Amino acid sequence: MNRQEKSVEISELSKIFSSSGSVVVAHYKGISVAQIKDLRKKVREAGGGVKVAKNRLVKIAVSDTSLKGVSDLFVGQSLIVYSVDPIVAPKISVSFANDNKQFVVLGGILEKDILDQDSIKRIASLPNIDGIRSMIISAIQFNSTRLVNLLNAPQTKIVRAISAFVDKNQQS
């Protein structure tokens, strides 16, 4: 890799770190090419990407940013899983790590915060944005139905009481 190629690679890495909602760093030693292709496909379908980069170039890319601490994670065979959606990269990475024991999640970045392995696993257990939206809509629909029933209940009781009174008077 010549100097110009390295410069292009560093700018690509800087762009990934600055524009992604989440970035997960993982070791992939012992993972087959087919498994990496499968990971790339899953991440791409979810709107993200997977990048294998030289550790030295990653360290240069983050050296002038607030993400300098993430460079400590880049030791050995490391790759980056990234996405604009903050939940996608952690969720897919942790799921892939559960299926492939050689794939080890080391940590990552959420927005501009550096996270450890446990934090990435906790984030992976959260629902994605579509899941959160559906939960909010369900809660609104359920509560609005309860409100309508609550508002209709007194009217129904009054109508029943008047109807019973009228029936009683007609019988007398």
From Swiss-Prot:
InterPro entries according to UniProt: Ribosomal_uL10, Ribosomal_uL10-like_sf, Ribosomal_uL10_bac, Ribosomal_uL10_bac_type, Ribosomal_uL10_CS_bac
Database matches in PANTHER family: 39S RIBOSOMAL PROTEIN L10, MITOCHONDRIAL (PTHR11560)
UniProt keyword annotations, A-Z: Ribonucleoprotein, Ribosomal protein, RNA-binding, rRNA-binding
Function in brief: Forms part of the ribosomal stalk, playing a central role in the interaction of the ribosome with GTP-bound translation factors.
Subunit composition and interactions: Part of the ribosomal stalk of the 50S ribosomal subunit. The N-terminus interacts with L11 and the large rRNA to form the base of the stalk. The C-terminus forms an elongated spine to which L12 dimers bind in a sequential fashion forming a multimeric L10(L12)X complex.
Any single Gene Ontology cellular-component annotation: large ribosomal subunit
Protein name: Large ribosomal subunit protein uL10
Domain of life: Bacteria
One Gene Ontology term of the molecular function aspect: large ribosomal subunit rRNA binding
Presence of keyword Ribosomal protein: yes
Entry's family note: Belongs to the universal ribosomal protein uL10 family.
GO BP: translation
